[in-house]
Structures are given as C-alpha cells and as structure tokens.
Amino acid sequence: MFCQFISRPAQSLSGKFSSKTLCLPLIASPVRIKHTVQGYSTFNAQQNAGNKQQKKKIPLWPRIRAFTTFTFSGILVIGATGLAGVVIYLIGAELFSPSGDTQIFNRAVSKVENDEVARRLLKCNDTETSTERLKAYGEILTDDRWTRNRPISSTRRIDKEGKEHYLMRFHVESKQKMGIVHVEAKESDVNYQPDFVSMYLDIPGEKRHYLIKPKLSIVKPKGFLGVNWGPKRD
C-alpha cells in the first residue's frame, strides 16, 4: 500500500493558520493484460503453394517465344547501331578526309578562283574592291538548284607503282561564261593531301588553259630484244 501526503491548512485556537500534512492511502487499480492469439489459416498456405506450382508449370512455348523476341530485338538494335556507325564513318571520311572528293573539289575550285587567266577567260566582273564569285557544280546542266548540288563525278585508279590517282571533272560558271575543269591528283609520299598532277580549263571558243601542266615522262628507247646495244651513254 502506498501513501500520498497532502498539506491542509488548519486554524488554531489563537486564530492563526497552520498547515497539517495528511497521509492518505493509495489503492492500486488492477492492470488487465490482453493476450493476442494469432490464428493460422490453412487456406492461405494452400493458396500460396498453388501459386508456386503455377509459376513452376509455365508452358515451354511462351518461354521460347519470349527468348526469340528478346534475341531478335537485341540483334536488330546491334545491327542498327553498327549500320549507323558505318554511315557516320563514310560521311566523315568523305567530308573531312584529305583524300576525299569534297576536299579535292574545294582545293580545285580555289585554284580556279585564284587564277587570273582563268578569271579573264571566264570574263568575271572583277573590280578593285570586289571579285565575282564563281559557281561550281556537277555534270548535269539544268536550272534546278537541287540538280546542281549533285555529287561531282570522280573516278579512282591504281598505277603501276601502287599509288592511287584521282580523276575529277566539274563545271565552273560566271555570269557570262561557262567552262569545264579537268583535275588529276596523285597520292603523295610526303603530304596527307593528294598532289595535283594536272588541271586544265576548257571554255567553248577559247584555247585550253592549263592551271597545272602535267610532267612529261621520258621513256628510254629499247634496242633489239629489249637490250641497248652499243657503248653506254652518260
């Protein structure tokens, strides 16, 4: 049993107040303990076991179909990625490679634009402050802008020394005249860019103008049966 102390004011005979302490017993109330009983159902256990059996008993054909679909999708993605890589490489090699047709064409057009004789033959309207810009395009001559932007005609061949030669032909046009430029370039041993071997301009009614004259190779004559008879010449 526990006691609780309470202070209570009291009045004495003389009229003064004083406090008295009282001890009151405390009775503890009973505490109820609740027991929780968890029930177990055999129905849930049987249902879980049935779901596991259904998962294990998946037919073979859906598995094969899912595997085939996944494999085909993977092959398709890998093939598309590889094809895109090849296309990007070809475009990059064509546009940025020193031996690409685009680079050779741009170099040839710059040579024609900077050649005074070619500009005079094309009757360019040049002044002291400005120069006329030439037009350069492919083989087909039409008024259609999309047709003019077709690729330049070019061919490549390998010579006896194993070096690659580049042959190109394109048109240049001013406001008054039009001409055809023939270009031949050869793989260089020193530079990354091919070296121009020959370049000339043909304008109707004008004499052929060589921007770069080809070097004539001297062929030594051979004697009887391929042997040069007689004394050796220095």
Swiss-Prot record:
It comes from the Eukaryota. The keyword Cell membrane does not apply. GO terms for biological process: protein import into mitochondrial matrix. It is a single-pass membrane protein. The keyword Glycoprotein does not apply. Residues 93-234 are mitochondrial intermembrane. InterPro entries: Tim21, Tim21_IMS_sf. Essential component of the TIM23 complex, a complex that mediates the translocation of transit peptide-containing proteins across the mitochondrial inner membrane. Required to keep the TOM and the TIM23 complexes in close contact. At some point, it is released from the TOM23 complex to allow protein translocation into the mitochondrial matrix. This is Mitochondrial import inner membrane translocase subunit TIM21. The lineage of its organism: Eukaryota, Fungi, Dikarya, Ascomycota, Saccharomycotina. The gene is TIM21.
